[in-house]
Amino acid sequence: MRRFSTIVDLLISKKPSSQANSRIDLICKRFHISRVLNNDFVESTERKNGVGLVCPEKHEDEFAGEVEKIYRILRNHHSRVPKLELALNESGIDLRPGLIIRVLSRCGDAGNLGYRFFLWATKQPGYFHSYEVCKSMVMILSKMRQFGAVWGLIEEMRKTNPELIEPELFVVLMRRFASANMVKKAVEVLDEMPKYGLEPDEYVFGCLLDALCKNGSVKEASKVFEDMREKFPPNLRYFTSLLYGWCREGKLMEAKEVLVQMKEAGLEPDIVVFTNLLSGYAHAGKMADAYDLMNDMRKRGFEPNVNCYTVLIQALCRTEKRMDEAMRVFVEMERYGCEADIVTYTALISGFCKWGMIDKGYSVLDDMRKKGVMPSQVTYMQIMVAHEKKEQFEECLELIEKMKRRGCHPDLLIYNVVIRLACKLGEVKEAVRLWNEMEANGLSPGVDTFVIMINGFTSQGFLIEACNHFKEMVSRGIFSAPQYGTLKSLLNNLVRDDKLEMAKDVWSCISNKTSSCELNVSAWTIWIHALYAKGHVKEACSYCLDMMEMDLMPQPNTYAKLMKGLNKLYNRTIAAEITEKVVKMASEREMSFKMYKKKGEEDLIEKAKPKGNKEGKKKGTDHQRYKGRGERSRAKAL
């Protein structure tokens, strides 16, 4: 395990690899009807202005004090490894697996913080990572898309502690491949398992099908299922996975074909199969078929359960005109003695809030509490989003306080909503207060939270604070794939306000060798165009040359802009250098330089035209085209 720090140091600095995939999801042995509502139903040194990043306060449990102590050390020294290791060595921390896991969890999306701590712990005498710690680290690395490092860790586990390698690691790996739509790699995990002393069984294969079907690859899952029929004989679990996948995509004919295959295999559908089919009908808008299926279920001796009613209510809540029908289904459910649970109530609240009926949402909220069903953060989230749409900031704050009084503490998603609204309304100090409160409650901001704050600071002119948060986000390893909208807005505002050095500092933090950010042509184009727009032509050209050193060819309009700017400066030397490299790159890519150059010039001319003139010209052209034709020929042309 000691060699792992060397292996990962080599891998972590590279771009994410497609040869090794992540394994973040915990093993879920229940295969179908995920009852968590989807997106359809949920639609950073203090400054004199009170703006800045703060350290969180303590949690009250066994590890609380040490966790926050370590987290503060990581926050303060993560960009300077020698100082970080010295501070950790002098901290007097008693390492044990439970503490390591808590620290990794505390780091949240800040993968670099957890990674640095894991490496430091690896080097400590007398300490050895447990299976749970290694699995947690695998989750963090895979979430950072450092897949080479993930494989490096597993390989090191095989050499030093092979008994720590369990099938669940590979199940998580398959799920991460599936979520990235890398079906071939997901299937290849089955072939890799024997190399680590494990043989894939029916459970592992079932997890593979389940992962593919839940991530939109049901067609590929069907092929894998057919190809491996002999090795893994069909069972009800496999068919249920395929049925779920087809129903989720709204392909009911294929779903019915799965039912036929199921019967041919001598298998009878159970309540889960019926619920999946019911969900398929409901979300395809075929409510009459869904109701008929409910009646058929009763005839077959399957009394619809809360899952069945909930999928109907969720589907009905998608349409404003069918909210009354959703309530009728809810009443019918109670009439049949089926008690609604938190997901059912949340679906109703989500529907009312989605269509602006917040008062009815609160009414359902009160009703569920009276019946002993305690709302969750997801439930409150529906109402919070509705208040955000109406820009009701005070109501959001009141709801947060109400949640706290009821023992349901706001999660990261809820803070994101309220902070976003505060920034939108110009309440930057309130946004910072909420940020500080969030971190004090032990919540680590993710990329969404950082982006919200950065955009809020930028829009209100707090550019120094925006830069600080941006650099903090990058240093925590959260910004591995640039959010181009945020990057463009920040760089453009800095250059526009003549803060060129600050802009260069921002760019350097994502382009240096230690950064895990993925920089492509789009990111470089944003930076080069921002410099050019403010008249910094030579700097733009310098960065363009840097980009080409990385074997990235500038876009045609970027080349055309730089040539135009250099022509005005009478700087033929730099123009010749850039042109020579572009010609060479075009040749290597079997492109015509003349066509490339012409395309760039045409793009500049097109962008220089006022939009109104272009539309007017287009209309005039159409008028001339059809002038003098008869109605029949004009209709034919259209």
UniProtKB/Swiss-Prot annotation:
Listed name of the protein: Pentatricopeptide repeat-containing protein At3g49730
Lineage top rank: taxon: Eukaryota
UniProt keyword annotation of Electron transport present: no
Species whose genome carries this gene: Arabidopsis thaliana
Keywords: Repeat
Ranges for the PPR repeats: 130-164, 166-200, 201-231, 235-269, 270-304, 305-340, 341-375, 376-410, 411-445, 446-480, 483-513, 520-554
Residue ranges, annotated region (Disordered): 604-638
Family that this chain belongs to: Belongs to the PPR family. P subfamily.
